[in-house]
Regions:
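A conserved acidic, glycine/proline-rich C-terminal tail/linker
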Residues: 187-216
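HotDog/MaoC-like acyl-thioester-processing domains
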Residues: 2-7, 62-66, 70-148, 201-207, ...
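Hot-dog-fold acyl-thioester-processing enzymes
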Residues: 1-58, 106, 113-195
């Protein structure tokens, strides 16, 4: 059984930003879709997991941007599961222009037994015989972001909409970065030379939830907190 899943693709206009480049939130969605395709091949896709009362949970994601491809540009996508721990899984991603690495990413997952409300051991999930021959596409650790920011400024609000909700009944993973980046003017995003984005998922959100966004900036780093009242639901770091 092959550890790596690869495919050729064209960057779709729906995933591009105001500059005609693959957007930051579009990258998260592209990698999530790629992981979903590979999960089907491995027998751990949504339908197969639902039959076992299991559901994939995204814990955290880091994406490193060396360059971003343009609208309709031909790229090569690759993803693979890393050797799992007892309860946590990591998956790597790469996006290349020919042999040139443009974007690399890594996501930590867990599997929830929806009937029992407990995490499922990795030995009960991944197919037997899968060779874990490839390490991580990202050498840096996931960001460690404080759950509370001292003297942080609230700068935006976002109400979770019906279009944000997925089949699990809560806000889709790809909707969080979309809401996050949409809270900034395009001019400010253009002025930032964003090279790395970390997302740390803390709590599920539901349609109608009012989320407040806070920010705290230091040299080259912008930390963000998304909260529902006092509860932190998402932490993010944009690094230049």
């Amino acid at each position: 059984m092959q550890q790596i899943y690869e495919k050729d693709a064209l960057i779709p206009p729906s995933a591009c930003d105001y500059d005609g480049l693959l957007s930051y939130p579009g990258t998260f969605a592209l990698f999530m879709d790629l992981a979903t395709e590979h999960a089907l091949h491995l027998g751990v896709g949504f339908a197969a997991m639902r039959e076992r009362d299991c559901f994939w949970l995204t814990v955290k994601t880091k994406i490193v941007f060396h360059d971003r491809p343009a609208l309709s540009e031909a790229v090569r996508l690759a993803t693979w599961p890393e050797k799992p721990g007892p309860l946590r899984f990591n998956r790597s991603y790469e996006l290349r222009r020919s042999e040139e690495l443009l974007i690399s990413g890594r996501t930590e997952w867990a599997v929830l037994n929806t009937a029992a409300g407990t995490l499922v051991p990795s030995a009960d999930i991944m197919p037997a015989g899968l060779a874990y021959e490839h390490g991580s596409a990202v050498s840096e650790s996931y960001a460690r972001i404080p759950d509370r920011f001292a003297d942080a400024d609230a700068f935006a609000e976002y109400t979770v909409r019906s279009a944000d909700i997925d089949i699990g009944g809560h806000m889709n993973n790809a909707a969080y970065p979309r809401a996050l980046f949409a809270s900034f003017p395009s001019g400010e995003l253009k002025a930032r030379n964003i090279r790395c984005v970390d997302l740390l998922f803390r709590a599920p959100c539901f349609e109608g939830d009012l989320l407040t966004l806070y920010k705290k900036e230091s040299e080259g780093i912008l930390d963000l907190r998304m909260a529902r009242a006092e509860e932190t639901v998402l932490l993010a770091r944009l690094a230049e």
